[in-house]
C-alpha cells in the first residue's frame, strides 16, 4: 500500500503481530509520506464522550499496513 492510496477517514488493518488491528487515518503528512492513525475503538469511545484528546495516536508509514478495509463517509 502506498501513501497515495490512503485517504483521511480510511480504516486500515495493521500487519500481523500488532496488538491493535484496526486504525483510522486522521492526517496525511506530505513531508514524510507517513500517515497519522489511531485505534478505531479508542476513537469511537472518545467521540461518544466528546473527549477532544485522542489516545494511542501513531505516525506510521503506509507499508506497515496490509490492507484498507473501508472508508468512512465523514472526513475528520
Which functions belong to the PLM regions below?
Residues 15, 19-54:
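Basic/aromatic-rich interaction segments and small domains that mediate binding to polyanionic partners
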Amino acid at each position: 500500500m502506498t501513501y497515495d492510496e490512503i485517504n483521511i477517514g480510511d480504516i486500515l488493518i495493521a500487519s500481523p503481530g500488532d496488538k491493535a488491528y484496526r486504525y483510522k487515518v486522521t492526517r496525511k503528512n506530505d513531508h514524510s509520506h507517513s500517515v497519522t492513525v489511531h485505534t478505531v475503538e479508542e476513537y469511537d469511545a472518545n467521540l461518544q464522550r466528546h473527549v477532544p484528546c485522542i489516545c494511542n495516536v501513531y505516525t506510521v508509514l503506509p507499508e506497515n499496513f496490509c490492507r484498507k478495509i473501508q472508508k468512512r463517509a465523514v472526513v475528520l
